[in-house]
Structures are given as C-alpha cells and as structure tokens.
Amino acid sequence: MRARLVDRGRLMELALADGNSYQAQCERMGLQRHALIDYISGRRDPSTASLVAMADYYGVSTDYILGRGGR
C-alpha cells in the first residue's frame, strides 16, 4: 500500500469548515466535480496544480495540506 500525498484529516477539516458542498468547493477551485471527495477518501492524489488551487482557496500553505507544517 502506498502512502498518500495529502493529509486527509486536514483536508477534510478544511472542507467541512468551508461550509459549502464539496461540489461547490470544487467548482470554485476549478477542480473536477468529485475531486475533493476522491482526495479525502484516498482514492487518488491531487496534481500539483490542484494542490495549489486548494491551498489558495482555503488560505493555507501547500505544506499544511501535505501534513508538513502549520497553516
């Protein structure tokens, strides 16, 4: 089993705190409709562009989403 790129717990926390549906968040970030669910569930890892889009949208660093540091 391979390690996942993102810290799924942190990503779920950010997504839930946003208050919008996962689909709405994806649309605002320019991601595919179910991308966020796939990243949180561990079905797939985000591309670099998707990781940057999520960090920008949530106002955190990419390192935070990767589980490597503070916001």
Model-derived features: where do they sit?
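Short alpha-helical DNA-recognition segment
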Residues: G19-D38
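Key DNA-contact positions within bacterial/archaeal DNA-binding proteins
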Residues: H34, R44, D63
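Alpha-helical residues within the helix-turn-helix
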Residues: L16, E27, D56
